[in-house]
């Protein structure tokens, strides 16, 4: 689905350039002066390498992003991952995920939304277990808990958690 939307955006861009108009004018006009956006957490260690295993580095990164004006932060609480692997997350990983979310929520308070994206890497049962452990941290959404295109599995997860399920 991502490839289709990317292709559509490219087509709109081409049409806009040919017409000499911004795309928003072609699709009905300007609606907002500014829009809220989120950023993904890319914590780095002292060597400048991305390090997704240290909750303290993730907290540091979250605070820097908030200083830049972001009010929504997306991250994978269950990484490292292998997209479409459909694996069952271990208790150790569940505890680590909860620790990440607890520390980030404590650092940002209610000043920032947390968005979880897990790259479609889990079975429905595993996604449900993770969602239920992370509900206390009040995430705005849980994106692709199971592989995209598995509507029944997404519905199964959505029925067992208060966290809104997203895809895209």
Task: State what each model feature region is.
Residues 131, 143, 155-158:
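Generic hydrophobic alpha-helical scaffold/packing signal
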Residues 38, 115, 143, 164-168:
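Structural detector of well-ordered beta-strand residues that form the stable sheet scaffold
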Residues 121, 147-148:
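Short, surface-exposed acidic/glycine-rich loop or hinge patches that mediate macromolecular interfaces
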